[in-house]
């Protein structure tokens, strides 16, 4: 956002506390500063990740440890998320579902091959047959997915109704809206979806970083999903570059 959000221009601080209580300016003015290099990130990913999206169990566990040690929501964001989640999580068994639409359908290089809505619905039905879930929590950036799920599972589907969702092949991250603090809200909405998915008892989803984060947060709490189905259609290798 061009204006201050929660008193800051730092997008990380829109939602999170700084791990050590220092600001960016504090760090820049310190006598000794160590900066990470992109090459270090490449080495870590080659060692612990199968591809740009799929994590090894060891890598996920290491990230869960880091999350547990360093990552904290700020007071405002934590209160907002807790308040929003209480309407869905009321001691019912909840199956979380993440369906990624919009720009995933465009098939960009190094992005997951899009999961079809029919694939997701089929796996949800299988999970419902094997486990007792009273509710389905649906996290999606696609308007049509909400309509399909409500038709397939009437009275069972819950989702956040204030989420900005798209209809075409363009990422909602590039969307424009008249609502106040639109891009801050986009960040909050995906963060809230992630924490909601982490709070679910089961999970059906395709490959995505939102799902990776939910699994990391889940493990950091010392819990496991009763059922976990990650639909993996592979990664696009076609040279098509991501664009607005």
Regions found by a protein language model. Give the residues of each.
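Catalytic "initiation/cleavage/transfer" segments centered on a nucleophilic residue
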Residues: 187
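A structural signal for short, well-ordered beta-strand segments and their strand-loop junctions
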Residues: 1, 96-98, 137-139, 158-159, ...
């Amino acid at each position: 956002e061009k204006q201050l959000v929660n008193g800051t221009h730092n997008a990380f601080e829109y939602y999170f506390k700084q791990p050590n209580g220092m600001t960016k300016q504090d760090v820049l003015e310190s006598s000794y500063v160590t900066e990470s290099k992109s090459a270090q990130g490449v080495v870590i990913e080659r060692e612990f990740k199968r591809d740009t999206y799929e994590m090894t169990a060891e890598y996920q566990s290491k990230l869960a440890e880091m999350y547990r040690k360093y990552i904290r929501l700020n007071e405002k964001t934590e209160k907002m998320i807790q308040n929003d989640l209480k309407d869905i999580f009321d001691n019912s068994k909840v199956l979380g579902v993440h369906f990624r639409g919009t720009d995933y359908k465009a098939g960009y290089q190094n992005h997951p091959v899009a999961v079809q809505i029919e694939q997701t619905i089929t796996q949800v039905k299988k999970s419902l047959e094997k486990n007792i879930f009273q509710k389905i929590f649906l996290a999606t950036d696609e308007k049509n997915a909400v309509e399909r799920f409500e038709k397939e599972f009437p009275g069972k589907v819950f989702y956040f109704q204030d989420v900005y969702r798209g209809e075409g092949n363009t990422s909602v991250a590039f969307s424009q809206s008249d609502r106040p603090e639109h891009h801050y809200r986009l960040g909050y909405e995906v963060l809230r979806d992630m924490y909601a998915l982490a709070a679910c008892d089961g999970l059906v989803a395709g490959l995505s970083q939102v799902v990776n984060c939910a699994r990391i947060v889940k493990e950091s709490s010392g819990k496991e999903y009763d059922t976990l189905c990650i639909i993996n259609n592979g990664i696009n290798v076609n040279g098509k570059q991501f664009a607005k």
